[in-house]
Every structure is written in C-alpha cells, then in structure tokens.
Amino acid sequence: MINIQEGISSINRIKTGVPGLDMIIQGGLPKNSITLVSGPPGSGKSILCFQFLLDGIKNNEKCLFLTLDKKSEGLIVQAKELGLNFEPAIEEGLIKFEYLNINKKEVYEKMANEILSKNYDRVVLDSITPLAEMPIFMRNIEDLDIDKNNLIPDDFPADTALPTRRLHLRFIMTALESSNCTSIVTSELPVGSNMLSRDGISEFLADGVITLSLDPTMDRRKLAVMKMRNTKHTLKPQSIVIETGGIKLI
C-alpha cells in the first residue's frame, strides 16, 4: 500500500505569506501549481495576491503581477495603504506589475510572452474573469513557447476569433504550466454565490481552489480551501480579518 502521507510530505511547497493559511495546507502551495482564488468584490483577493508575492520577494524570488482590472499604479498604492510596500522590490527588479488591455487582440500573446520569457518564480493574474468573457484572437500562436497539444482544433485558422470559454482558460493555464512558476489566478464572484468561479470551468483546470466570502450582515469574512492537489486539508471555512499587513486567519 502506498503511504499517501509520506508522498505528500515530500512535496516542495511555496509559502503563501498569509498568517495561518500555510498551517492548513501542509506548509504552503505545491510548487509549480496554479491556484484559483475566487470571491466577491472586497473579499481580499488582490490582498492575498500581494502577500503571496511579497513572501517571494523576501526570498529573492522573481515575481510578476498581471492585472486586467486596475492600472498598476493603483494596485501599488492600494498595497502600500495596507503596509505592503512594493516600491523597493520594483526598483531592485524583483517584481514587475503589468497592466493588460483586454481591448487589444494581442493581449493573449503579450501575456504568454511575459510569463514565459523572464523565468518568474511566482506569477499572479488578477483577474481571469475579463479574459474568460471576451472573444479570443490567436495570431502567430506557433511563435509562443507553450504546449499546444489539443489547445486549438486543427480546422481553426490562426486569424479566427474563437468565442470558446474553455479555450480561453486552457490557453492561460497552459502558459502558466509551461513557465514552471507557482501562480495564483483570481476570479470574481457575486456576493453570496456558491460557485467556485465566474466561468464554471477554471476550478477544474486549476490545481487548487481557495474561496473568499463576505457576510455583510454579520460583518465577517471567511476563507475556505476547496481543493488543493496532493494536500490534506479541511473544507471548513476559516474566519479571517484584513488589517495592516493583509489577511490573517483567526
């Protein structure tokens, strides 16, 4: 009989930077994994991403924050207001904030090239929702250094728009997998939703799923680990607070 616990304990793990979270996922996220973080506006998705990247910076790891919802400058200010200062790391070249304009057809190629060309250790994509809801335009896909097996059917011309949600998400996930980084992608959810993602697909493609929820009437927040590859974890929602320094489990 295979000793599952022994196999799990030997897996390299990457700390999240969130106090209390690593304790319930056996020390951190599996290295080179993709974790989906879903939740409504104001639940702390971007903050969790800030903490994840700052933990990497402390270890001299190269980090990338790809944003589609907010300009990079606004995110840096938001983080600083929480006591999370990225400016020294930006000056040292340890992290890059990149705003992606989803109105441009080259957004997918630009995203994939950035992820694959710089040997990043940690990557955040905040959020995946706009990409999953727009037509996809694949130009010069053969120039991208990713595993293209089963990515696009052979009978689709390279210049064709493919309004296929699964294709959008598989392209994004394949780029992240090919980079050998540890990554977090976020997804927007309505308040009170029981879904794991807005698109209903990315939770199956990701290695892990963490949900953040709000209860405005009780003035409380929760975090739950719904899925984590090769990890023993509880499904019980954990109470969290957001304070100076970010999210903390209580």
Spans of features found by a protein language model:
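Pre-Walker A adenine-sensing motif
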Residues: T16-G28
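Short hydrophobic/aromatic beta-strand immediately N-terminal to the Walker A/P-loop
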Residues: T35-S38
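Conserved P-loop
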Residues: P40-E106
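Loop/turn-to-beta-strand initiation segments
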Residues: K62, L94, N119-R122, S178-T186
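Phosphate-binding/switch loop-helix module in NTP-utilizing enzymes
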Residues: L100-E177
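Phosphate-binding/switch region of NTP-binding enzymes
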Residues: E177, T182-G245
